[in-house]
Amino acid sequence: MEKIQDKKTGEVVFYKKHESGLNIYIMPRKGYTSYHAIFGTKYGSVDSEFVVPGEKEVTKVPDGIAHYLEHKMFDQPDGSNVFDKFSAYGGEANAFTSFNMTAYLFSCTGNFEKNLETLMDYVQSPYFTPESVKKEQGIIGQEIRMYDDNAGWRVFFNFLGLLYNNNPVKLDIAGTVDSIAEIDSELLYKCYNTFYNLSNMTLFVTGDFDAEKILEVVETNIKNNVPFTEEIKRIYPNEPKAVAGKFKEQTITVATPMFMMGWKDNDTGYSGRKLLKKSIEMEIITEMIFGKSSAIYNELYDEGLINQNFGFEYSPHIDYAYTAIEGESKDPKVVYEKITDYVDSLRKNGLDREDFERIKKVIWGDYIRSFNDIEGYSHSFLTMSMLDISYFDYFEEYEKITFEDISKRFEEQFDNNYSVLSVINPK
């Protein structure tokens, strides 16, 4: 195993690239009473068109199939329930599908090795029958209809639909009732055999244990030792720079109007340290201009235009990225106008160097504290590894960032020609 150490914090993670292609990260945490493991594949809702390694034909699958596959992974040939197995060992299991990743995870305070064996066993043991796949359509169809009436979900996907013309990130992760009706067991196996090949997967485990012993458990439970010899070719449509629309509103049962506004980032197409540096720069910038100490936050709050539910984030990915602001307001359009005017004034007058120095220290503090949240850290580590980023490279990239870098990045990112507003109004 390779020992990787964070030069600033001293935290250590052990890494091994298994002969199966599986990326294994083991992070011992002395004195911690809980354990966590997350087993993920670089496969999400946007991966609906691809070429399987060794094939020439393009495979196009229905929208929502990655999420559907995640649901079906819990089926067992003997009819048992995976969650019951975890419960028997005191483990709490879960899974999720995002745009770019599917992950299976558990937390426990004991029986870590038994829970880890259970995780590795079921994720490597697909069992799909035509009958069970058909049955799931009704369950997921109900879930889709439920999200159709979920204001938080709709304000978000309407926002993405305004930002993106063609990129599949604008499509609901679960698909539509019509698209999932096209899914059968044969398609599920094809997607599983393509994207759940261990060369496309990463396992991250953390807790108070001996790293060598845990590696032995992992290697003993690896079932498929045949990695792909070539990359999975993922096919995404070309995305123009322009946004698809500027404004969309929808009416749903909510107490107060909800909004999500933001800016499309057209600086995409790369991963690794370059993406990490941009992400840290955007963390600093968004906190500087929208955080609770910012002029615009206090103006909006004092005027009663926002409440405590105001939030913001920068979402970095290889093929798409955006900055989003969300909240509740009696007048979302006024909030949008005030924020975009504020951004224009900052573009004209420049950012504040003292704000930069202060917020940069705040962001570093957030990074240090992230190590205390085992589940959050595990999720972040896995997500970053799939973007070819090492969590432990954070400090080196953080140290490089200057006020000039921040100013340049702000100019690039906050062009109101690429801003949009999504609103949910009460019925």
Segments from the language model and where they lie:
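His/Glu-rich zincin catalytic helix
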Residues: M1-N81, Y189-Y192, Y196-E299, S419-K427
